[in-house]
Structures are given as C-alpha cells and as structure tokens.
Amino acid sequence: MKNLFKHASSSWVRYSQYEWRKDKNGKYYITPAPNATPIIYDPLKEYQQMVLDALNVGLMIRTSTKRKIREAIMGFVTKYGLLGLMTALPTTPSFIDYKAVYLPTNHFIREEVMDTQKYLSHFFPFEKPDFFKNGKDSLWNINGDRTMIALAMTFQKEPIAQVMCFMRNYAERYDWLEQTFRDWSFTFLSSFLFYEDEGKMDEDTRNIYRQGMAAFGGNAPSYHMELRERPVIVWVFHSLLLAIQMMFSFMLADETSSLRLCKNCMKAFFTKSDEEDFCSPECEAAHKQENKK
C-alpha cells in the first residue's frame, strides 16, 4: 500500500485549538477557535496511526458516556483536523463549478440535488462566507484575515470548496462526526466478527454481514499522471474523510495487514505477529482471568 499511494496530494489543515458551538436549532458543531493557528500537514505520513485512532473513537462510542465520546471526538479533531465533510459528501469536490450540488445517498442529507448556498449553510452555520453564486458563475471574497488569505493562496490549485473547509468559520456538526466514526467501527467489527464466527453463523446471518460490508464505500479519490523520473500516478484527496476511508479500506483488504481487534478490551491495534489476539500483556492476563470464572 505504501507504493500504491507513494505519490499523493494529501495536504490538510488542522487548527491549534477547536471549540464547541451551538446553533439556533440546538445542534452542536466543532469549529476552529477564534485565535487558533492553522497548521498544514500531510495526514498520509502517519496514516496507520490516524486510521487506528479513528477506529478506536468509533469503537468506544458503543460503551462510553456522552462526555467521554465528546472528548474523544474533540481529541481526534484537534490532532488531525475536521473531516472535510463538505467536499466528501457530494459527487465531486468541485461542486461550486456546477449549477447545484449533487449528492449520492448518505446518512446526513436526504436531497439528491441541493442549491449551493443552502448546502454551504450546513457547514457555515454561524458566519456565512462572502460568496455569490449565479448559475455556474461564482465569486468568493476573503476579506481582512491575512492568515485566511495566505491559506487560500497556498491551496489555490485545489477546488474552492476544499479551501473553504480550511477557513476559520467552517464547522462540522457533532452528530455527523459521531455517525462517521460509528460507521468506520461498524465496518471494522463486521470484518473481524464475520471471519471469527463464520463457522457458527447460518447463511442469513452471513448475508447480513455481507450486505453491511457492501454498503461501506464512498467517492474515490481522483488521480492524474505526472512525468517524473518515470511516469507516476498522483492520487488527490480532497477531504480527510476520504483519505481515512481509503487507507482503512486497503488495510481491510490487505492480507498482510496487522490490524486486529483486541479480544479483551475490544480496541483496534497493530500486531507484531499473526498469533497476537491482545493489545497488551495486561489485556491477555485479564482475558485469561475472566475465562477462569
């Protein structure tokens, strides 16, 4: 997999601090704090840890309190940034170049076609961007904030919507974030339990697992060819969500992947050998003690 995504345009932005905000309808959002500093980084350089962190946030949702879940999701966002749901959900991250936003089936928005301004309002609930749209024509002004202007200049070759995801007034709904982490952990659990208990399942149960796995998917990253020391494929990720989802998918399908589920604490971890079933000696000892009862 390293070779497959050796060349990737995957720079992302996280802020030094995020905060909770509630809109007029009582929905909670995570958004950069007013004085937070944007930090540009490459999430694919540490993709294994990022996927592991995402899975464990999702896995802990099943058993943890609301407070701990909120803390875990905020911790992930602080470490890696918001997921870029605005560019991940539509059929194309360049949706601003079209008359409307076209959306495949998803958990969050039922409409298949949506007015661009209405769609943007889902991600800018507090401070609207200075954005004008008329048919395919659009105009976006960034005024006053030199840091935001610098970010826009840095990512000027990317779709406008992706750059908007990096703005200080961009926000993502907490319940949408929570559902995304749930989906990832459900897929991971399904893949683990299917092969762990396959011999004990009837065919109807197997089909339920298969259907659940088949529903996992999303938009594929775009790519282009470049002539370097030799022709290379350059993959382009326009959202952190897509980067995580693609890396996770390849881990699941990779026969040599060391990604496992601890039989004791039910956390995801990477094994050092095929015989390992526990993330730590403490978990192994606790599991053995439990089985003695």
Features from the language model and the residues they span:
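Short helix-coil boundary/hinge micro-motifs
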Residues: 1-269
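Short, charged low-complexity intrinsically disordered segments located at boundaries
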Residues: 219, 223, 276-279, 292
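Cysteine-rich micro-motifs
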Residues: 273-286
